[in-house]
């Protein structure tokens, strides 16, 4: 019988104490009677009595049977029926590859749920103003709707309402401190404010609460590396950018099209470290790649190759200031 590596993360919010207690009772009943305790999550480890929610920060089980996986997911789906907000992601992996992914989120007829789901669909279609109205309604119905705050934060960011975006991301993080999406969004606002140190802190939390099988993990490493580069923290930039440079992204992945920029910035970081050999290798690699989503020119790359071959560190790398180092914008795409 095959065993699988299981990763779960998420949160369910309940509208009141009664809903929470019913969810808890149903979970315990299914675990005890239906599944004979053949699950890998005990209620006392995931039900937060003080906050009336189910909290599962990133949880990893190295060896779980197919049956235990199915039982646990089924029990969590039962819990979700009583929730008004939240979501849970579950991955089943074999030999490092995802063979099943489940996203569990409320889908009932309550107005808070339907308003959020509508807002989520509208966000995906780029209808930001209509999405904001729907998410406003979801938040009015459920003040602890972390997912609605997070989605509205991204809408406000795209509408360039950066102060409102920061408010939304902060509210989402208060309810769910383990939300990788909310920390990622807040980091973007910090970058707009040129507060790269705070952005890096949020990116660190994003990495802690995401996994390499998610696009957000690699996008975070790429942009975090860029922040380190801007601050002149070249060793840290190299540490983040090397794994991204080695990764192959499929066209449907939003990380696709950024590899030339990654190699260019990696070359800059090596140049700042006075590692001219590796700088030349990275920059030549960038030169050989086709144009992607960056706005780099051939002259940008050739100019740095010339500097690296001269064995001299340009002044902008010796005394880095925000804006002095060209990173291959658009920075926040």
Question: Where do the PLM segments sit?
Answer:
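Helix-start (N-cap) detector for alpha-helical repeat units in TPR-like alpha-solenoids
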Residues: 112, 146-147, 180-181, 214-218, ...
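Alpha-helical segment of the N-proximal tetratricopeptide repeat
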Residues: 105-161, 167
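Structural marker of alpha-solenoid helical repeat scaffolds
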Residues: 141, 175, 209-213, 247, ...
